[in-house]
């Protein structure tokens, strides 16, 4: 295995893993309602929603970034409770926490755990998207 095949490049270039050329890497969320979930992530990423019957793809500058698939029986995680634990979450590292917080709240997020210390590199705040999937805004410099 070559050094190139063992590492993943950034989104700007091809992604090689064990000789496999991956054109796009997309996180997919299940949701009982596609519109609020895809609209939320399109707003967060400043992208557009490509709509199909039971699938929405959020693209940014024409590149697929997040998928939302219809899951009529989707039950939101109940974080931090363990009755319905999270299975995946995104960490979004932001330079301007107050602006990012205002944006995700306006798009329909809700706070699950407030930051203890809203200073750069010190903390993070946990939110849920409209379908209940946890994600974090991580404060950086």
Language-model-detected regions and their locations in the chain:
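Extreme N-terminal basic, low-complexity initiation segments
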Residues: 1-9
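N-terminal beta-strand motif that seeds the catalytic metal site of vicinal oxygen chelate
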Residues: 9-38, 44, 88-92, 138-141
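Core segments of cupin and vicinal oxygen chelate
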Residues: 19-21, 28-71, 106, 112-122
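Vicinal oxygen chelate
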Residues: 32-34, 85, 90-130
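Active-site beta-strand termini and strand-to-loop segments that position acidic
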Residues: 58-62, 127-130, 140
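Short connector loops at helix/strand junctions that flank enzyme active sites
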Residues: 61-63, 83-87
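A short, acidic/glycine-rich surface segment
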Residues: 73-79
């Amino acid at each position: 295995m070559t050094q190139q095949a063992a590492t993943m490049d950034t989104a700007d270039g091809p992604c090689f893993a064990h000789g496999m050329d991956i054109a796009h890497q997309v996180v997919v969320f299940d949701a009982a309602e596609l519109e609020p979930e895809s609209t939320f992530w399109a707003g967060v990423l400043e992208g557009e929603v490509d709509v199909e019957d039971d699938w929405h793809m959020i693209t940014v500058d024409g590149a697929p970034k997040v998928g939302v698939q219809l899951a009529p029986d989707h039950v939101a995680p109940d974080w931090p409770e363990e009755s319905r634990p999270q299975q995946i979450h995104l960490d979004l590292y932001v330079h301007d926490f107050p602006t990012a917080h205002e944006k995700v709240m306006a798009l329909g997020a809700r706070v699950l755990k407030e930051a203890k210390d809203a200073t750069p590199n010190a903390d993070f705040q946990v939110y849920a998207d409209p379908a209940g999937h946890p994600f974090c805004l991580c404060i950086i410099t």
